[in-house]
Amino acid sequence: SLDPAISYARASGGTGTAVVLKTHPAYQSLPGARWVNWAMITTWFDSNFGFGKPHIGDDIAYSIGFTLPAGAMNASLTGTFYADNRGDGFLNGAPIGGHAATPFEGGFITPASVSAASGFVPGANTLSFKVHDAGGVAGVAFSVTITYFAP
């Protein structure tokens, strides 16, 4: 099924609505989060496992928007995410955390944190995760909390 709140943009081309994945046996779970991918399943993974389409060596940005009311003060964001193979988080295009690049790139096993106390704007904001796929299935799962004071 599609997750209409999350969009994707592939570095190699293509944009659209993210697809909710079945859980890959190696993927860690995150309370309240679902793994998403960029494509409906159309490869051998579908018949064997049904958990996503491979996109070898591609970078995929997954984004979700949120709105801060006019006059919002002291906005902050904290959260955790998993990415296959690794990922970086961004608030309105500015980096806010991510996985270190390692030879194994096990971002689907080890979570990364994101946090921001600045970079918010009144109105529309965008939280994005740029995921690097080193081969095979890829995706992202995230859970964030956004707080602010509204006078």
Which positions does each model-derived feature cover?
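Extracellular/lumenal carbohydrate-interaction signature centered on repeated Trp-anchored short motifs
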Residues: H55-G57, G71, S118-P122
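Extracellular beta-rich ligand/substrate-recognition surface
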Residues: T43-A61, H99-I109
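Accessory carbohydrate-binding/adhesion or oligomerization-edge regions at the termini
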Residues: S1-G50, G65-T67, S76, Y82, ...
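Surface-exposed beta-strand edges and their flanking turn/coil or helix-capping segments
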Residues: N92, T110-A112, F142
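Extended extracellular/luminal ectodomain segments enriched in beta-structured repeat modules
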Residues: G57-I60, L68-T78
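Short, surface-exposed beta-strand/strand-loop-strand elements in extracellular ectodomains
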Residues: R86-G98
